[in-house]
Amino acid sequence: MSDPVIKIAHNLYRVPTMGSGINSFFITEADGSITLIDTGLKTAPKKLVAAIKYLKKDPSDIKRVLFTHSHDDHAGGAAKIIEIIGSPKVYAHEAEAQYLESGKNPPRDLTHLAGFFFRFTPEGKFNPIKVTDKLIDKQVLPIGGGLQVIHTPGHTPGHVSYLHQESKTLITGDSVFNFGFKIAWSLSAFCTNFNQSKETALKFLDLDFDTAAFTHGPHIQKGGKQKLKKFLT
């Protein structure tokens, strides 16, 4: 059995909640507090709690919950894990907060055939949560030695990626996936504006990072920027 957490840097961990197919992330602080990035599906809280205990921590040590965006594979476990934690601060981009607070998915891109076709399929649902702190592009949070917010809209209106400056790790969210054997775009069927998603991912080329971490797929410990650059260009 694989470990419930995978260390990326001394204070940054990847938490596979459905194998490497869906990941959350922990950032630990010297004061013992933890930041959680994305909460996975509704079934994920059990895995998140197990991961916390594996690190010899308590769920109440999670003081901040950050989101890349509001789809159910990122926010499905939010209400439950927040209930377990207590009253953490909850962060999302200012253009994404409305979806988290309503429990509704952002609109789909009907200009692409996949989005047009899938508009009739049921969307994953999640219980609404209260966003306490609204993020903006280029904001640097005092988390883990500096966590920069990169607004990468397109997958959703308020989709963000995060740059963990201390370890030079980019957390892409759903801007791009890593299937292990190749890097790929997110599925157009689940984007609000697929073309915009591809355009805003080019922001990654101007960032200083070596490790690339993905919500969907294993992280690339070394040479992550080079591999992303090859894909993006």
Task: For each feature predicted by the language model, list its residue ranges.
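Active-site HxH/HxHxD metal-binding segment of metal-dependent hydrolases
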Residues: T43-P45, K53-D133
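Metallo-beta-lactamase
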Residues: K7, L41-T43, E96-P153, T192, Q196-F209, ...
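Conserved beta-strand hairpin/beta-sheet module of binuclear metal-dependent hydrolase folds
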Residues: S2-L55, S161-G173, N178
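Divalent metal-coordination and catalytic microenvironments
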Residues: N11, I27, D38, L48, ...
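Residues at alpha-helix caps and immediate loop-helix transition turns in enzyme cores, especially N-
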Residues: K47, G77, G224-K227
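Residue-level marker for buried hydrophobic side chains located in beta-strands
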Residues: T35, L66, V90, T169-I171, ...
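Short acidic, glycine/proline-enriched helix-loop-strand junctions
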Residues: P88, Q221-T233
